Amino acid sequence: MAVKIYKRTTNGRRNMSVLTFDEITTSTPEKSLLAPITKTGGRNNQGKLTVRHIGGGAKRKYRIIDFKRDKDNVPGKVTSIEYDPNRTANIALITYLDGEKRYIIAPKGLQVGALIVSGSEIDIKVGNALPVMSIPVGTIVHNIELKPGRGGQIARSAGTSAQILGREEKYVLVRLQSGEVRRILGTCKATIGEVGNESHELVRIGKAGRTRHLGVRPTVRGSVMNPNDHPHGGGEGKQPIGRKQQMTPWGKKARGIKTRDKKKASTSMIVRRRNG
């Protein structure tokens, strides 16, 4: 998908860019696969703020995506490629031979009219989903399950992918884009190909208003807050933070501290840590 850069007609338009949406074939979603989505403003069920910088944004409906790809050995035809406001990747509407319709994440190169299928003994073709144990070494995949039947959890964003590196007994080694090498149970499913809409990372938002339309609120520096709001706050005018190192808003060290739980069960599945 190409990127269109606007001319410098105003300060907001200067070097602003948008996707051209050449791959999108319809602007009307499948009504049976829509669900209401309620805005939370970053609050939990107690009304407490749990995620900062969330609020507002354009109204949207959730598209129900088939991450499990559990409709085995039933061919489906790609009916349309659509925009999804809830994710960076595009989605593809699949109509199966028995008449059922489902959305999947649209891989790079998937065209309207193409046939895809899920199963254990099928062709290695873009859009097909099969257990990672059945995928040849070196194949690029996305939408990878961490537990069989739970649905894909890894490599779902625009332009992301992973690569099958090898096999270890009942596990398969997968290298993620971060450089992390991870063991995946061989019965977990993955989809062939990389996620499409890889130009998404090239888009320049250009102005604050576009970010607000996306439902993202402003980020305020801790140094300009009051001391009761942030450890960096307070002082007359511009002041140093007054501490040996940077802190989070909750008073914890913000640099050089590992944030992953040391007792996390899946740590044993990580063969090599991610780069950086």
Curated annotation (Swiss-Prot):
Q: Which PANTHER family match?
A: LARGE RIBOSOMAL SUBUNIT PROTEIN UL2M (PTHR13691:SF5), RIBOSOMAL PROTEIN L2 (PTHR13691)
Q: What is this protein called?
A: Large ribosomal subunit protein uL2
Q: Which family does it belong to?
A: Belongs to the universal ribosomal protein uL2 family.
> Where does the record locate the signal sequence feature?
none
UniProt cross-references to PROSITE patterns, sorted A to Z: RIBOSOMAL_L2
Gene that encodes the chain: rplB
Q: Name one GO cellular component term.
A: large ribosomal subunit
Q: Name one GO molecular function term.
A: rRNA binding
Would I find Membrane among this entry's keywords? no
Where in this protein does the record put region Disordered? Answer: 219-276
Record SMART domains? Ribosomal_L2, Ribosomal_L2_C
Q: In its UniProt record, which GO terms are filed under biological process?
A: cytoplasmic translation
Q: Known Pfam families for this protein?
A: Ribosomal_L2, Ribosomal_L2_C
Q: Which UniProt keywords apply?
A: Ribonucleoprotein, Ribosomal protein, RNA-binding, rRNA-binding
The record ties this protein, via InterPro entries, to:
NA-bd_OB-fold (IPR012340), Rib_uL2_dom2 (IPR014722), Ribosomal_uL2 (IPR002171), Ribosomal_uL2_bac/org-type (IPR005880), Ribosomal_uL2_C (IPR022669), Ribosomal_uL2_CS (IPR022671), Ribosomal_uL2_dom3 (IPR014726), Ribosomal_uL2_RNA-bd_dom (IPR022666)
**Basic residues: which segments have biased composition?**
252-276
Per UniProt, subunit arrangement is: Part of the 50S ribosomal subunit. Forms a bridge to the 30S subunit in the 70S ribosome.
Q: What does the UniProt function comment say about this protein?
A: One of the primary rRNA binding proteins. Required for association of the 30S and 50S subunits to form the 70S ribosome, for tRNA binding and peptide bond formation. It has been suggested to have peptidyltransferase activity; this is somewhat controversial. Makes several contacts with the 16S rRNA in the 70S ribosome.
Q: Report the superkingdom from the record.
A: Bacteria
What is the protein's species of origin? Acholeplasma laidlawii (strain PG-8A)
